[in-house]
Amino acid sequence: RRSLPELDSNHIQPLKKEMPSELGSFNETRKRYEFYNGSTIQFQYLERDSDCDRIQGTEIHIALVDEAGQMTPYQLGYIKSRMRLGNYTPQQEGFLPRLVMTANPGGQSHNFLKALYIDPAPAESYFFDHTMRDPNNPADKGWLTMYIPAKMSDNKYIDPSYASSFSALPEELGRALREGDWDLVVG
């Protein structure tokens, strides 16, 4: 997310409400959930590109980026550059870093996301993210990637009247958001 209030209301507060206290506790100062087994869930917002400095040196195993279309291409690339798993054993190979992003059509990274994740292959088909390829290893094809489309109607938890609120938007954008159609709008 782009701001602490967005991060707090959409992710931190729901997690604090749902996470059983037997598993760990939330550290308000560090904005992270600390499990008693030593694992953590770190919450971070990136309002400006310069905020990426706060995650420099961070080893991220799993990154979950909500509303990726609102981030800049630089921020999304920087997050990807922090994805690593140091000193892992062959048994841990299946736990290599994972990046999951959610995004709606539109936003400042619309064209970036569409070109990198939506256009390269049919929906729900694996392909390689060539930007995550080791240039010194000709055998490395990049990260295995998949685009999973979604429509507003796929979310059974949304109030049925929510769709009507999109009538206040330009018609093409409202339709793109309802249908999850990345071809309807230009970022």
Feature roles, as predicted:
Residues 1-187:
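Phosphate/NTP-binding elements of NTP-utilizing enzymes
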